[in-house]
Amino acid sequence: MKVGFIGLGAMGRPMARNLHRAGKLTGVWNRTAARARAFADETGCRAFESPADLAAACDFIVTCVSADADLLAVVDALLPRLRQSCIVIDCSTVAADTARDAARRLAAAGGSLLDCPVSGGVEGAKNATLAIMCGGDVDVFERAQPVLAALGRTNVRMGPSGAGQATKATNQILCAGAIQVAAEAMAFAQAEGLPLDSVVAILGQGAGASWYFVHRAPFMARGKYPAGFRVRLHDKDLRICRDMAARHGAVLPVVETTLADYARLLATGHGEEDISTIFRLKTPLFAGGGG
């Protein structure tokens, strides 16, 4: 089994590292070549000069890129030297229609796509505990199991091509609600004069806890928002959710509220911070109260 990896960002780098630890990684490619060379120096794998070179050497290719156009550009770059029956496992978050488009392009060249977006944050990527939601043919999903097992704790086939991305869109709506609630609750606790570290410690064990409260409320307590899930990326994802909902004639209030908040954060230079920086917008809600 020869596996290549494309996209060594905050999520991709630790995911590729886990494939290396599992003894499956042949090599990597990254748009910023220096990042690929540094990873190759660290792990001893190969840094390919182009996606086509990687495609010629690998039976499985994992991709993790930032945007729909990036994914389609990578897929097109793979096609000239794609091995027959190669499986591309795309862990990016893109529109379901984009996943289906990529699947059609690969199928025409004799390959297959699994759309396999992930959830679990940078922590999950580092610890290989990601939840992986998959769309594609059953036989392709079964063949990809050794690769998926090296990347995450759980993987489930949700349906045909695009179903993984539709599931991820659902997840991103959940994330919007969770971070909104966590930020408003923490702002309320702060206004009440409660010790925020203690709030996290006790309520993180309660019925109202969520992954975002447990793992991101501490960022709010410290007022530090190191990049985990960047505002600009969740903003991109929620725009996908908005478009998908619009096809059903629906407007989702939590999506619209969060996009409005993100517009303010992006305009004030916080787009590269973790989405927990939304706490900045919640504390002023309590500024008009009495002492």
Task: Give, region by region, the residue ranges found by the protein language model.
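Rossmann-fold NAD(P) dinucleotide-binding segment
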Residues: P51-S112
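Interdomain hinge/lid region at the active-site interface
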Residues: S161, A209-D274
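NAD(P)+-binding Rossmann beta1-loop-alpha1 motif at the extreme N-terminus of oxidoreductases
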Residues: M1-T63, C86, V122
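Active-site-proximal catalytic alpha-helix in oxidoreductases
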Residues: A128-G135, V156, P160-E192, L203-H215, ...
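Rossmann-fold dinucleotide-binding core
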Residues: T93-I173
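NAD(P)-dependent dehydrogenase/reductase Rossmann-like domain
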Residues: A267-G291
